[in-house]
């Protein structure tokens, strides 16, 4: 296959494109990007046939900041006839053998969502045809490749596959989360998604456990504090503004009316530091660096607000600088990852874990 198809947020195509060009070059794979603003996807077309599979295998999806999902794809199928869209798709997937799942998707745009009903109905007959051809197993198998059919326009689709161990478990790479009725703000979904994304499911009980101490910088009105409280943690909520009364009534929150940039925790046995402040990303990064150098937390999730242009370059520079500063100050054992999550808008979410080699 010659194309790598990447889902992203509408308006972030240039950032996703810039990132995949850098990552492909690191693997000495040549190609060029094809994208349009607000299409919510990027195509990286390789110069050599078969290189798309190399990228899909060797670039970790989790290591990409702006891509929600990716798959190796054939050339765009155009003019799929209304009377028989299935045959051309089955023919295009002849090199795929015994896949474990089928996903018929669209990009995440308002226009594309109008095709979602069609995609659901079309999935059933297409699944049967792919089983008959041998491209798809009779029963779903989470260890086998995933077939993707993405309709980018009426009668136009990219088809291909992703590897189950390097793929989002969600359609279009979008987790469907519901906001709780008593949550103080919609921002609560950002931290909920961040925990799901950055902390493996089998480790969540250990790393997000009841009784842990946490600090939320810039907490008002309590959207992020809410996620910590509902997991049984005790939270120092730092903000000059008022906190949600329901959170305060739990007895798990102590409100410090202070500037998050000047606050020093009275106790240093903190497992989680979280921060979602509207501030220059470099200043937030410097704040987290200071806490890390002082050894005041074990893990942190924080948001970096993005500039209007050159967002990939800005984030990459900030993360590289953070790694350099931590190492210069004797913090050598750490891991850092960033993702433009579905519930993020003009920001990216970063996870920093200190001493990941040590048990929790």
Swiss-Prot record:
Highest rank taxon of the organism: Bacteria
Its EC number(s): 2.1.1.186
Keyword Transmembrane helix: no
Cellular localisation: Cytoplasm
Catalytic activity field: cytidine(2498) in 23S rRNA + S-adenosyl-L-methionine = 2'-O-methylcytidine(2498) in 23S rRNA + S-adenosyl-L-homocysteine + H(+)
Keywords, in A-Z order: Cytoplasm, Methyltransferase, rRNA processing, S-adenosyl-L-methionine, Transferase
Enzyme class: transferase
An individual GO BP term: rRNA processing
Name by which UniProt lists this protein: Ribosomal RNA large subunit methyltransferase M
